UniProtKB/Swiss-Prot annotation:
The keyword Cell inner membrane applies. It is a multi-pass membrane protein. Its main location: membrane. Permease that is involved in the active transport across the cytoplasmic membrane of all three aromatic amino acids, phenylalanine, tyrosine and tryptophan. InterPro entries: AA-permease/SLC12A_dom, Amino_acid_permease_CS. It comes from the Bacteria. The lineage of its organism: Bacteria, Pseudomonadati, Pseudomonadota, Gammaproteobacteria, Enterobacterales. This is Aromatic amino acid transport protein AroP.
Length: 457
């Protein structure tokens, strides 16, 4: 009985430094790069490389802000805890629930992408069927224990990293050995209408989709409560992940866009698979499709982990039903995994009803939730830093360029929202932000009223 109580509300610290680095890396190397980059290439051309560098810098600032807070206070629920403690109870409530919804939407987008990748081999299989099968498999794995999740995500991410590095090396060899055919040349980066064929506007208009690619880096913060040694592992993961991401994103896209003119890229297929398919290398195209499928499953796996831990943190704060604040004897928050899975299952229905537009719609909703998420991290960090300065505390892992870095991030978020308002198909998700904030407000008032009623009794 004592043992049951001891484990009743505690997550196990079963994640090592290698797990944490690859969870964050795996969270970012996914559908945004492998599938989302297609529409960016069509609009921005080779300028996509500059776009990823800009968004990568913003993502790094956000990660360092979150990293500073997490190293000081490694807790479940990550930044919703900081918003709650340093900003106010509504901020904690809103940021936590927004993050949970964000990752439910990301999970839906990744499952949709899985369906598209399966169609590369089996065009007759509807996306909703593939989504349903992998939905069941990944959730079943997450119901084991955190170390199994960590190991699986570690190997998923290793496959992605090796594949991206191998693709950069193999693509480079094709490029410089002359085996890539007459169209393979570094001059493709500026010959087809210039580096920015549609001007700087073409690139700016794509920043929202590029931002989608970097969503997932903040998973480092969520892992803190289950990290063996957060004071060492979080700073190391934060600093190393961003350099690797930029090398992978910028390196792979530079090689890719040199192998073939950017004008040949189509929106529905991964440009990585398409280019090797067009070069006539069916083996590499098939191998890469396995990799992009693994990438989507890896991010979905991270989503299942992340959603359940965020909901667990919300329940511990009293912002979600108390039943969700329990774990089984292995330290697995089974209830939160099942609740998150139930909502994510809507993805199968969306793919059944609107298979063609499902991915675009989900991606737009993800970016809106991500804007709220990153803005709240930046704002919560400013309040956290002020509180620490007033207490005379010198933090161990200070964020870069504080407070200027925070204002740069907030300006970037505002620009992304304006871009989305001007983008057909994306504007609806921006209009939904005030609606979503009202829903959160009603939920918060209901929670407060219920809490008061319980106290009165």
């Amino acid at each position: 009985m004592m043992e049951g109580q001891q484990h009743g509300e505690q997550l196990k610290r079963g994640l090592k430094n290698r797990h944490i680095q690859l969870i964050a890396l795996g969270g970012a190397i996914g559908t945004g790069l492998f599938l989302g980059s297609a529409s960016v290439i069509q609009s921005a051309g080779p300028g996509i490389i500059l776009g990823y560098a800009i968004a990568g810098f913003i993502a790094f600032l956000i990660m360092r802000q979150l990293g500073e807070m997490v190293v000081e206070e490694p807790v479940a629920g990550s930044f919703s805890h900081f918003a709650y403690k340093y900003w106010g109870s509504f901020a904690g409530f809103a940021s936590g629930w927004n993050y949970w919804v964000l990752y439910v939407l990301v999970a839906m987008a990744e499952l949709t992408a899985v369906g598209k990748y399966i169609q590369f081999w089996y065009p007759e299989i509807p996306t909703w069927v593939s989504a349903a099968v992998f939905f069941v498999v990944i959730n079943a794995i997450n119901l084991t224990n955190v170390t199994v999740f960590g190991e699986m995500e570690f190997w998923f991410a290793i496959i992605k990293v090796i594949a991206v590095v191998a693709m950069i090396i193999f693509g480079g060899w094709l490029l410089f050995s002359g085996n890539g055919g007459p169209q393979a040349s570094v001059s493709n980066l500026w010959d087809q209408g210039g580096f920015l064929p549609h001007g700087f506007t073409g690139l700016v208009m794509m920043m929202a989709i590029i931002m989608f690619s970097f969503g997932g880096l903040e998973l480092v913060g969520i892992t803190a409560a289950e990290a063996d040694n957060p004071e060492q592992s979080i700073p190391k993961a934060t600093n190393q992940v961003i350099y690797r991401i930029l090398i992978f994103y910028i390196g792979s896209l530079a090689v890719l866009l040199s192998l073939m003119p950017w004008t040949r890229v189509t929106a529905d297929t991964s440009p990585f698979v398409l280019i090797f398919h067009e070069l006539g290398d069916t083996f590499v195209a098939n191998a890469l499709n396995i990799v992009v499928l693994t990438a989507a499953l890896s991010v979905y796996n991270s989503c299942v982990y992340c959603n359940s831990r965020m909901l667990f943190g919300l329940a511990q704060q009293g912002n979600a039903p108390k039943a969700l604040a329990s774990v089984d004897k292995r330290g697995v928050p089974v209830n939160t995994i099942l609740v998150s899975a139930l909502v994510t299952a809507l993805c199968v229905l969306i793919n059944y009803l609107a298979p063609e537009s499902a991915f675009g719609l989900l991606m737009a909703l993800v970016v809106s939730a991500l804007v709220i998420n990153w803005a709240m991290i930046s704002l919560a960090h400013m309040k956290f830093r002020r509180a620490k300065q007033e207490q005379g505390v010198v933090t161990r892992f200070p964020a870069l360029l504080y407070p200027l870095g925070n204002w740069i991030c907030l300006l970037f978020m505002a620009v992304v929202l304006v871009i989305m308002l001007m983008t057909p198909g994306m504007a609806i998700s921006v209009y939904l932000i005030p609606v979503w904030l009202v829903v959160l407000g009603i939920g918060y008032l209901f929670k407060e009223k219920t809490a008061k009623a319980v106290k009165a009794h």
